[in-house]
Amino acid sequence: GGAIGALFSATAIYLSSFSLLLVGSYFTGIYMSAHGFYRFAASDAASDDFRPKAISYVMAAGLASAIIGPQLGSVMFDALSIPFMGVYAATFALNCLGFVIFPFLTVGTAKNETKAPRVGRTRLEMLKTPRIATAIICACVSYSLMNLVMTSTPLAVVGCGFAKESAGHIVTAHVLAMFIPSFFTGHIITRFGVERVVGTGLFILMGSGIVALAGVDLPNFYIALILLGFGWNFGFIGATAMLATAHTVEERGTVQGMNDFMVFGLVTIASLTSGQLMNCSGGNPIEGWSAVNFAMIPFLTLAFASLIWLSLITKKAAKTEYLTEKFPE
């Protein structure tokens, strides 16, 4: 899908066809939605102990993308006779690498599984499972709030009188903060438990909002966006690891699909809402930036409440199991 989308887009640039560019973007969207499942593929192929680390390492690849992508785009922007055409040509070439790499990829667990009729719980029953519901809520909140704030950041930075270059540097620092922790997030999850890591991520997101609301100087923007990146990493990777342990093998495709549909659907809404919040005070950037960060409060409250709910239910179940074993009927 990515290669086809890039090919259509490059052709659209060459022919100056906006309609063809939309077709290319459609295929690119399909590709983008599919590659989000790489983290689940790594999780499904890993052992129980290595699963959080596998998810974390896949997400860490985003660091290379964050560094290589912009540089490649700058180099290829005018590499061909028509601006942007070289960018799509490079994208086509990168996607074609998958045809070389994936034939050599073997996932051992797939060989041991036999196809069987779909059995088990309905989607609604799955969503009523405390661990699945909590994982999806925390993933949605972590990703959506990160996107909500990040989308408005360049507008707020420039609107507060700082240079566009400063806005770019702040976003770069944020992206690095999103992916650098991935090299050790999995180890932290294994050591301290997924619920604590997700909770820590939510606290860091809250800290990001507090710093942002404390002032509109450059240090505030830098610190807030770096914290936003760290909070997203712990919250989203932790929630993904939590979800991976909350369903059966037969249910994983359905659960993973529901999760990503909700997460990225809400991310889209957050992106659109971000601009509206920035404009809610008639275009005043300081008041708009405050509105964006105040909007985090109810959603963080929901995520914290879901984690507390899960903790109480888990403790109650453990206590019941202990009493049953100690005092059998």
Ranges and model annotations:
Residues G1-L15, I204-V216:
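C-terminal ends and interior cores of transmembrane alpha-helices
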Residues F18-L20, D48, Y57-P103:
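Helix-loop-helix hairpin linking two adjacent transmembrane segments in secondary transporters
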Residues G24-A60:
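Cytoplasmic helix-loop-helix junction between adjacent transmembrane helices
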Residues V75-A93, Q276-L300:
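A membrane-interface helix-boundary motif in multi-pass transporters
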Residues F77, P181-V194, M278:
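Helix-to-loop junctions at the C-terminal end of transmembrane segments
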Residues F92-E113, S306-S311:
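C-terminal membrane-cytosol helix-exit motif in multi-pass small-molecule transporters
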Residues V107-I136, E325-E329:
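Juxtamembrane intracellular "pre-TM" segments in multi-pass secondary transporters
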Residues E250-G283:
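A late C-terminal transmembrane helix in Major Facilitator Superfamily
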